[in-house]
Amino acid sequence: MPRKRHTRLVSQPTPISIQEILYTTRAMRRLRTDPVPDAVIARILDSGLRAPSGGNTQDWRFMIVTDRDKIAAIAPLYQAGLAQLFEGHYKQANAATRAAMASGTADRRTAQLGRVLDSSEHLAAHFADVPLLVFGYLTSRENAGSIWPALWSMCLAARAEGVGSTVTTILEMFAAKEVDEILGVPDGSGFYRHACLPMGYPTGRWGVPDRKPVSKVVYHDTWGTPPAFAPSEPLWSLHG
């Protein structure tokens, strides 16, 4: 039975700074089952559509899915796709990470990867309970550059609303046709799906994710030369 949608006007959340949005928007794969109200979804979508596209063509379509039966039908496709990914491209890294975690020899980066693997498996196991999916389509199969700014803007807008999100292409890699059939996308529509954003209120807390510092990944004028001003630690934190 479809879950009843929230149609009442939902007040906007307490504003947070752009720095907090940028620094704390990270992959949130552990989501509560609470529905995301329609008014919140509308703000996320409307904000995301302000993003640029190549030539301002806006040759995109976005599909939002809240129907419980459709999400339940998509869930096993996502689970099978993740299993294929873990048994294929990520098989060696997955096995090595699991072994290091089990033996207590994991370093900081390995432990971080272990948490990513755990949260990815959690999302797959609970995919049928995700309250909101956002799919991004373009008229181009190869040139996805025009869809990513809008999708990421939606992730940022979701963060401003207290809604967690993550970007995944597993369904596009392993179940493109099957998902389109579930969603009623006609053959020959001329649109190609590029990514899925599972969204929902997170079970955990927001925080600044562990990332390599500017000084390690940015060069200035010459390859291999970092900027003299490059910080080695985040310039912003939740604690000021």
Residue ranges and their predicted role:
Residues T7-T14, Y192-G240:
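C-terminal helix-cap and adjacent tail motif
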Residues S17-D34:
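Generic N-terminal amphipathic, Lys/Arg-enriched alpha-helix
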Residues R30-R32, R61, S165-T169:
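Short catalytic-loop micro-motif centered on adjacent basic/acidic residues
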Residues Q58, I64-G145:
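Glycine/small-residue-rich phosphate/adenosyl-binding loop
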Residues A83-T97, L183-D210:
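A glycine-rich helix N-cap at a beta->alpha junction
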